[in-house]
């Protein structure tokens, strides 16, 4: 169910204003749906999203498309370091309403804040059948180990880690996180693998052009290797 090598990201799915500001261009809802259907028809069924993607419209689009073959990966994002009991459940219930579904295939702790409290809530929701698998995103090795320890106590597997990784961003390979995932049979999901198109020869636009401009220096060693 959750074993897939290519994940369809939906960070740019949303209103035209969001896409234009973030990436300098936008596509219609109809085009997004056609793209999703094409991906599913070719075996790419896992779609990764979050409540804050597309100014909140990304998840609503997924629910509106109502594609039964689509597998959904979404996230709980704690915007405050202070934990509030029930915050994970409240967020998931909103997500499920957006998706018009009774469960999500994978639920990630988007930021490693109040790890134990948030994962314990996820464990309850997992047992209730509202979550198919649990992961943690944007974490370091020690935080990943803590997450595994917490879930091991609950006899629930840590499904995966989702971090930034590409040819020019290999921090998690260098510091041992990727190897740890392999040794513990934990999936490692990489986001921004093409660096917003930089690794395909495209130039990012919109806000992304500012974010990725500082990374162009990292491309120089790659250019030398490629000749």
How would you label these PLM feature ranges?
Residues 23-39, 83-100, 115-120, 141-148, ...:
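Short, acidic/polar
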């Amino acid at each position: 169910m959750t074993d897939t090598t290519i994940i369809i990201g939906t960070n740019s799915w949303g209103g035209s204003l969001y896409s234009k500001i973030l990436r300098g261009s936008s596509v219609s809802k109809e085009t997004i749906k056609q793209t999703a259907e094409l991906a599913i028809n070719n075996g790419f069924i896992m779609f990764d999203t979050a409540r804050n993607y597309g100014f909140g419209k990304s998840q609503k689009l997924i629910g509106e498309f109502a594609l039964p073959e689509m597998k959904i990966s979404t996230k709980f994002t704690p915007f405050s370091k202070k934990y509030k009991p029930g915050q994970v459940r409240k967020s998931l219930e909103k997500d499920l309403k957006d998706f018009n579904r009774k469960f999500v295939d994978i639920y990630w702790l988007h930021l490693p804040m109040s790890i134990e409290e948030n994962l314990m809530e996820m464990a309850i929701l997992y047992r209730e059948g509202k979550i198919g698998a649990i992961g943690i995103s944007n974490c370091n090795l020690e935080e990943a180990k803590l997450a595994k320890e917490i879930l091991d106590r609950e006899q629930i597997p840590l499904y995966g880690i989702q971090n930034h990784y590409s040819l020019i961003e290999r921090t998690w390979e260098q510091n041992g996180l990727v190897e740890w995932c392999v040794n513990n049979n934990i999936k490692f999901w990489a986001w921004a693998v093409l660096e917003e198109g930089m690794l395909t020869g495209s130039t990012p636009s919109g806000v992304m052009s500012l974010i990725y401009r500082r990374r162009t220096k990292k491309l120089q060693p790659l250019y030398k290797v490629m000749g």
